[in-house]
Regions:
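Amphipathic, small/basic residue-rich leader segments at the start of a protein or domain
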Residues: 1-101, 393-397
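Glycine-rich phosphate/cofactor-binding loops in nucleotide/flavin-utilizing enzymes
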Residues: 4-6, 353-397
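Generic structural signal for well-ordered, non-transmembrane alpha-helical segments
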Residues: 33, 274, 295-305, 309, ...
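C-terminal helix-coil-helix/basic helical segment that borders enzyme active sites and/or dimer interfaces
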Residues: 39-46, 284-288, 303-337, 344-356
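Glycine-rich flavin
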Residues: 51-60, 64-170, 175
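Glycine-rich, charged/polar anion/phosphate-binding loops
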Residues: 170, 189, 214-219, 262
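DPxDG-like acidic metal-binding loop motif
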Residues: 170-208
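Glycine-rich beta->alpha junctions and the first turn(s) of the following alpha-helix
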Residues: 217-302
Length: 397
């Protein structure tokens, strides 16, 4: 039996249990033994603090390798399994879920490049195997935090310096700012004479001179994601660690970028479904409302998770990920609305004393709202989505 068939059988067995979050908790326990238990052993307030142990728990469990194939020493999870793990993490530690998504998003492009090579010992596969063996964390230096800018629009500039490059620029906010081992960032390349040479993804070691981390995140939620300002000043990058992307600045989508967008939308949405699930779980156990009201918030979340999993099953079945870009964005927006409804109703059903007596309820409700801030912004995406629904190529702004 192949690894894919074995994983599919395990997925079906786990989903056979109907208890809320049962499949997600079984999946994370099977793939990453001990991680969920360690997270559950801490109060939410501690896990969400700047001093949170959650990221190190994530690293130690091998969760950073979840998308890397097992033949390269990774976990080798299917897409559906990865989504369930992400929801489980979000239900325990929202900040960790955000940081984990940005790590996996950073790997998505590298995995796509590696999949295109027939050489099992290519630079891309060797790098991925090194990441897995050493449990390294990769921060994202892409333009995810900038309003109105493409997800892959270059945030930095690389200037030719002999055989290597000098990389300068900043990313804010940048999750995993203090815990990252590497950063993957988009950049515009300039030749010796300042001439434009195209765009690239640079792979940067956090130990190189010229990298500075400064406080940036001031919001009272999701502080445990370490989303601070990372500045690079003439950081020397070897040429082999500059992955060329041609002359597309990231406002359009080529296949590599599209794959990144799909994974970003799926994993980020699963993260916020996890946060909302933490509220719903409290309602099911402690809510003062009637049975119908409790069931309503549960089906809002379960229907959204089923939609996410349907895209995951397509990926696991061999569907070209590029063809799933529109669906992934539409599923994300539908889930975003369902999360807002479920969170608001959950707070009401838990009642004023639960809100007053613990910071957790208000915190989780506030955290779930942040999904609206991730790209692509819905208020500016209507025209592009409508055109895509009529058959045009999806453009993410």
């Amino acid at each position: 039996m192949s690894d894919t068939k074995q994983a599919t059988g395990a997925e079906q067995a786990e989903r056979a249990g109907e208890a809320f979050l049962e499949a997600e908790r079984k999946t994370i326990d099977r793939l990453l033994p001990g991680l969920d238990e360690r997270l559950a052993g801490h109060p939410l307030e501690e896990l969400e603090s700047r001093e949170s142990p959650a990221i190190e728990y994530f690293r130690e469990s091998g969760a950073s390798n979840i998308l890397i194939p097992s033949e390269y020493d990774g976990v080798g999870a299917t897409a559906v399994e990865a989504l369930r793990v992400q929801r489980a993490i979000g239900s325990r530690a929202p900040s960790l879920a955000i940081a984990a998504t940005m790590h996996s998003f950073s790997l998505a492009g590298l995995l796509a490049l590696a999949a295109e090579t027939e050489e099992k010992d290519s630079v891309e596969w060797m790098l991925l195997q090194g990441l897995a063996q050493n449990k390294l964390l990769v921060a994202s230096g892409f333009a995810e935090g900038k309003s109105g800018q493409g997800l892959f629009a270059p945030t930095m500039r690389a200037r030719r310096d002999g055989e290597n490059w000098l990389l300068s620029g900043s990313k804010k906010p940048c999750s995993l700012a203090y815990s990252m081992d590497l950063m993957a960032t988009s950049c515009a390349m300039e030749g010796d004479g300042g001439e434009f040479e195209g765009y690239a993804i640079a792979v940067v070691s956090s130990q190189l001179p010229g990298i500075e981390v400064e406080p940036f995140w001031s919001a009272p939620v999701l502080t445990g994601a370490q989303s601070e300002c990372v500045t690079l000043r003439d950081v020397e990058i070897h040429d082999e660690l500059m992955i060329r992307m041609g002359e597309d600045d990231g406002t359009g989508l080529d296949d590599l970028q599209t794959i990144g967008v799909v994974w970003f939308e799926l994993l980020m949405t699963a993260s916020y479904l996890g946060m909302a699930s933490a509220l719903v779980e409290r309602v099911l156990k402690e809510g003062k409302s009637d049975a119908n009201s409790k069931v309503q918030v549960a089906y809002e979340i379960e229907a959204s998770m089923a939609a996410l999993e349907s895209v995951g099953h397509e990926i696991d079945g061999g569907r070209n990920v590029v063809e799933l870009a529109l669906r992934s964005v539409l599923v994300r927006y539908a889930a975003q609305d369902a999360i807002a409804r479920a969170a608001a109703s959950s707070v009401e059903q838990l009642g004023g004393m639960a809100f007053i007596g613990s910071r957790d309820v208000g915190y989780l409700a506030a955290a779930t709202r942040a999904l609206a801030f991730h790209p692509p912004p819905r208020l500016r995406s209507g025209d592009a989505l409508l055109e895509a629904l009529h058959g045009a190529e999806l453009a993410v702004a």
